[in-house]
């Protein structure tokens, strides 16, 4: 245990040294603060001033000409022509300058501002009122602005980055986990760290339970921490925080639940390793997320945002639905409804199948996006699978990934039974063959006795 902890500390120190070496060739402010904060130019002494640049201010700002405000405002109502019956008079009027104030043949009507009531309420007489602005939109269409703004907030999220603008991934950007070298390196390392035990857990199941629980629970916690930290921190800070917390959990994953969470002191799972409970709940939330995305497609989310009119509240509702479904599946797994052996086999097979498929899908997506410029990616890895925008949808590639997960899970459960059935058939054939040999030997012995008798 001490050796493992020492090795994990060595790994963390090595990663920190690597980051410091990288920062020598990169801008630290860009890496850590998305270039929004500068340590070295914080004081006002480093700010550039116009008078220090020796630039004439007239090149920076050009003043506007004098404008006849009455003509400008009356243009909103239109111009009322009077006494222009001859075409020559009209041509003369067109050659006038806007700065002229003595215009005898033009009536300038007083401009009256629309009030709030007449602007938003439906009023059929608005268009007939000469005192209101002509050319304004129909108030009926203005009433739908609230709905349009809500739809804009949904499709084009409040965040400044354009990559959050699609509720369904349409391939107009490369997701962050495929575009940032730190995230690619970190996720690839974690998959490499667990890939061997994933295949062993898929084939052998509970016979490799100790190492499986230790590493796979750490992998699930890694994705949870990374998903949360990317919301609040830049990529490199998220990687550092995620590594520290992940390897801390690695050191306590085999501890009993009662030593970590005192709420489990009187429950039936108090002696179970905390890592095993994490794996069982991860399996529950994976299935729960599939059910949630089936019950709540993007059209349902649009209905939610239209009537709730609060994007954050909609996210909380969606998260509550996922957690509710997941807790139902979790309590179903730890109850006595299913035999414990079958439930354990299903957890091993399903979690192994999901992580194996997500591992290959992640590297395949990198190859598609970075080398083939193809955006038909699989949204099955945890970061994209549990995403509000872009949302997981049941398109062809995602349906194929889900089919592979469930097919591998069923095959992992059925394969040992088929193997056992073949072994039983082989044993039966051996027993029949051995019995035939015994009968042949007995008959031969009897024949020898008869021959000896005659001799």
UniProtKB/Swiss-Prot annotation:
Residues annotated as transmembrane: 12-32, 181-201, 220-240, 244-264, 285-305, 312-332, 346-366, 398-418
Keyword Transmembrane helix part of the UniProt annotation: yes
Residues bearing carbohydrate: 41, 102, 125, 373
Recorded phenotype for the gene knockout or disruption: Gene deletion results in fertilization defects affecting both male and female gametes. Fewer zygotes formed and ookinetes developed. Lower infection prevalence and fewer oocysts per midgut in Anopheles stephensi mosquitoes after infectious blood meal. Does not affect asexual erythrocytic cycle. Does not affect virulence in mice. Does not affect gametocytemia and sex ratio (female/male). Does not affect gametogenesis.
Topology term for the membrane: Multi-pass membrane protein
Job description of the protein: Plays a role in gamete fertilization. Required for the successful transmission of parasites to mosquito.
Keywords, ordered alphabetically: Cell membrane, Cell projection, Cilium, Flagellum, Glycoprotein, Membrane, Transmembrane, Transmembrane helix
Cellular compartment(s): Cell projection, Cilium, Flagellum; Cell membrane
One Gene Ontology term, aspect cellular component: motile cilium
Organism superkingdom: Eukaryota
Protein name: Membrane protein Pbs54
């Amino acid at each position: 245990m001490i050796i493992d902890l020492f090795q994990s500390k060595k790994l963390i120190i090595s990663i920190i040294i690597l980051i410091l070496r990288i920062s020598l060739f990169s801008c630290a402010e860009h890496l850590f603060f998305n270039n929004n904060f500068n340590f070295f130019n914080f004081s006002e002494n480093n700010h550039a001033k116009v008078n220090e640049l020796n630039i004439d201010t007239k090149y920076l700002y050009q003043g506007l000409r004098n404008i006849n405000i009455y003509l400008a405002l009356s243009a909103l109502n239109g111009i009322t022509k009077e006494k222009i019956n001859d075409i020559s008079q009209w041509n003369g009027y067109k050659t006038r300058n806007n700065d002229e104030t003595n215009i005898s043949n033009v009536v300038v009507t007083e401009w009256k501002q629309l009030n709030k009531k007449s602007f938003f309420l439906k009023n059929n007489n608005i268009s007939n009122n000469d005192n209101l602005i002509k050319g304004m939109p129909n108030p009926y269409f203005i009433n739908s602005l609230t709905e349009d703004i809500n739809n804009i907030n949904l499709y084009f999220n409040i965040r400044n980055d354009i990559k959050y603008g699609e509720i369904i991934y349409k391939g107009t950007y490369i997701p962050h986990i495929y575009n940032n070298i730190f995230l690619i390196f970190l996720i690839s390392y974690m998959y490499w760290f667990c890939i061997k035990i994933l295949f062993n857990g898929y084939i052998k199941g509970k016979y490799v339970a100790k190492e499986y629980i230790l590493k796979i629970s750490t992998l699930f916690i890694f994705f949870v921490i990374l998903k949360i930290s990317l919301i609040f921190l830049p990529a490199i800070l998220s990687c550092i925080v995620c590594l520290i917390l992940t390897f801390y959990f690695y050191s306590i994953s085999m501890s009993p639940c009662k030593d970590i969470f005192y709420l489990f002191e009187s429950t039936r799972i108090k002696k179970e390793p905390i890592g095993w409970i994490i794996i069982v709940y991860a399996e529950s939330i994976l299935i729960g997320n599939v059910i949630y995305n089936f019950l709540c497609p993007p059209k349902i989310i649009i209905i939610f945002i239209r009537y709730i009119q609060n994007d954050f509240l909609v996210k909380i509702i969606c998260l509550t639905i996922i957690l509710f479904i997941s807790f139902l599946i979790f309590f179903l797994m730890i109850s006595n409804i299913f035999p414990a052996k079958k439930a354990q086999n299903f957890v091993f097979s399903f979690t192994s199948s999901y992580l194996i498929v997500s591992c290959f899908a992640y590297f395949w997506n990198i190859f598609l996006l970075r080398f083939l410029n193809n955006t038909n990616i699989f949204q099955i890895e945890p970061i994209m699978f549990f995403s509000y925008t872009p949302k997981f949808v049941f398109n062809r590639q995602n349906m194929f990934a889900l089919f592979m997960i469930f097919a591998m899970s069923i095959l992992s459960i059925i394969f040992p039974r088929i193997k056992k059935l073949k072994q039983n058939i082989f044993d039966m054939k051996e027993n029949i063959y051995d019995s035939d040999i015994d009968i042949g030997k007995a008959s031969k012995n009897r024949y020898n006795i008869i021959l000896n008798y005659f001799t």
